[in-house]
A protein has these predicted regions:
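Hydrophobic, aromatic-rich transmembrane alpha-helices
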Residues: 17, 262-291, 326-332
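Perimembrane helix-loop-helix junctions
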Residues: 3, 179-212, 327, 333-335
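Short acidic/glycine- and proline-prone juxtamembrane loop motifs at membrane-interface regions
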Residues: 126-136
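Transmembrane-helix signature of polytopic, membrane-embedded enzymes
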Residues: 96-124, 154-157
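Extracytoplasmic catalytic/substrate-binding loops of multi-pass membrane glycan-assembly enzymes
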Residues: 28-43, 54-71, 78-81, 226-228
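Membrane-interface alpha helices of multi-pass inner-membrane proteins
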Residues: 158-176, 180-185, 299-310
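Short periplasmic/luminal acceptor-recognition loop of GT-C membrane glycosyltransferases, typified by
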Residues: 362-367, 373-450, 477-487, 510
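Membrane-interface transmembrane helices that cradle and orient dolichyl/undecaprenyl
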Residues: 104-106, 141-161, 169, 195-197, ...
């Protein structure tokens, strides 16, 4: 490596570090979508206080993020800075890894920098705070890339790393990792048969790491007294029942399947073109076969990402895949389809898609449903609590009156601080646990309607028992609902048989107090 190239690489890496961190911090401090924005904040705080997912609170997603956030809170204290820093570091990881990956695959260093810069803009800044789906997609993408490097260079160490990353993805969220793991096993089998002289060592290494990872998890559960049954019900069986229902309910309209993912499909078209060129070649040597495996696996994994995005029903968060696929398109069209017209089209797609989704999702905050918000109305959340200092508060429910929402939150905080009885909070504002220093923990990690089984679901009995045992163990006197939306029907009435024992009092527009101490469990 000559000195000029080395210096250029250092400059690019430094710029990518600054861009990935600064973009994420700016947008991570702008606006909130309470049900998503504060989910991991409270989970990290719970782990910091000695509580664990599956054991102390019902959790259907993202245990890895709980523990990562615990580390950030441990190192940098419980505050919004350490929360956004978590997401910013992950944004930097996918950015710098992409830069490394593109170079290793043969792309010019300057083009590698440009594509990676676009990834840094589109990946985590759309929400800016830790989010299970984004962690899962990022870890899965790195895993797939590492496997492609293993196939490209015929080096087994990449298969080890690929397995580790797919496990990290799985413990961020069950999908897309579960599907990608299966696809990787099939890809490895084909690679072994076609290119590796039927040497099964890559597959053995991959599966060995998967096995050892689960052994490590079991040991961790044993040390922390986390029941395996709870993990299986909460993280495997119940979410699988939701997934099957959502698959059956999928709407196969043009916009759902094609329209909303059009730029992703366009970024894949050059890859499909190269695949067709390679399939038509009469003589297929090891190099061509290897490249075919990499390109076909890229298409398969992209379809998995799109399918998983469709069944999650979130706003679309995978647009950062566009610069990734366009980079791969440039690598292989340059190698096999060297037409001067292709590269300009790829670069135009890159610039248009990056500008479009940066404006829509970062600036206009579409992911948080804040389309049309007035940035002049945002308020510093320091008035709520010093730990939220710098967060520019505005949310969907009070999009034109954030001052009213903050006033209600401050009033609620004051009321809760004056209640010295044992209490839990059921709320999307999941910072109340920390700002009131409440020692009791809600039995739920999350308050989305699908986070717990409905009464018709076969795992409802498991949830009901878990919820009531938690209240009994903690000797809970009061249950507070902090929300505009009435959630007691889902989170209380369904699990309390004798509802007459519950007395409630409406404190303010967002706060309702349920007196639970007279209920016998």
């Amino acid at each position: 490596m000559n000195k000029k190239y080395f210096n250029l690489k250092i400059i690019y890496i430094s710029f990518l570090l600054i861009s990935s961190i600064s973009f994420n911090f700016y947008y991570g401090y702008l606006g909130v979508f309470p049900i998503d924005s504060f989910l991991i904040y409270n989970a990290g705080y719970n782990v910091l206080n000695g509580f664990h997912p599956f054991k102390d609170y019902w959790s259907i997603t993202g245990p890895l993020l709980d523990y990562i956030q615990f580390i950030f809170f441990l190192l940098f204290d419980v505050n919004w800075f350490s929360y956004v820093l978590h997401a910013a570091i992950i944004n930097f990881i996918i950015t710098i890894f992409s830069f490394y990956f593109f170079i290793k695959m043969g792309l010019n260093i300057s083009f590698s920098f440009i594509y990676s810069l676009c990834i840094s803009i589109l990946a985590y800044p759309l929400i800016g705070t830790p989010f299970v789906d984004i962690h899962a997609v990022i870890f899965s993408l790195i895993s797939v890339s590492l496997m492609n490097l293993g196939i490209f260079y015929k080096k087994n160490n990449f298969f080890y790393y690929s397995a580790i990353l797919i496990i990290l993805s799985f413990f961020s969220k069950q999908i897309p990792s579960a599907y990608i793991l299966l696809s990787q096993i099939l890809i490895l089998l084909f690679y072994i048969y076609a290119c590796n002289k039927k040497n099964y060592k890559p597959l053995i290494n991959y599966l060995m790491i998967i096995f050892l990872s689960f052994i490590f998890i079991l040991v961790f559960f044993f040390i922390n007294d986390i029941p395996i049954k709870n993990f299986i019900v909460q993280y495997i069986l119940y979410p699988a029942s939701i997934g099957s229902e959502r698959t059956l309910e999928l709407s196969f309209t043009f916009n759902k399947i094609i329209g909303q993912f059009k730029f992703i499909y366009l970024s894949l078209l050059p890859i499909l073109g190269v695949i067709l060129i390679l399939l038509k070649k009469k003589i297929k040597n090891i190099e061509i076969t290897r490249d075919l495996i990499i390109l076909i696996s890229t298409i398969i994994v992209s379809l998995i990402f799109i399918y998983c995005q469709m069944i999650t029903r979130n706003q679309i968060l995978i647009f950062f895949l566009i610069p990734y696929y366009l980079a791969i398109s440039q690598i292989y069209t340059t190698k096999y389809w060297n037409r001067k017209s292709v590269l300009p089209i790829i670069l135009i797609l890159l610039l248009v898609s990056t500008a479009k989704y940066h404006q829509r999702f970062n600036n206009e905050k579409k992911f948080m449903d804040l389309d049309g918000y007035d940035i002049n109305l945002v308020l510093n959340s320091k008035v709520i609590d010093s730990t939220l200092s710098g967060l520019k508060w505005i949310s969907l429910d009070f999009i034109d009156e954030p001052d009213k929402e903050i006033k209600l939150i401050k009033n609620t905080k004051e009321f809760l601080l004056n209640d010295i009885e044992n209490k839990i909070y059921i709320t999307d504002y999941q910072f109340f646990q920390s700002i009131t220093k409440n020692d009791n923990i809600s039995p739920n990690k999350w308050y989305d309607a699908l986070s717990i089984p409905s009464e018709k679901n076969k795992y409802f009995a498991n949830y009901k028992l878990f919820f009531l045992e938690s209240l009994k163990k903690q000797q809970i006197d009061n249950i507070y609902f902090i929300s505009l939306e009435r959630k007691e029907e889902i989170f209380i009435n369904s699990v309390i048989d004798n509802k007459k024992c519950l007395n409630f009092e409406k404190i303010n527009k967002i706060l309702t107090k349920f007196i639970f101490k007279n209920c016998k469990i």
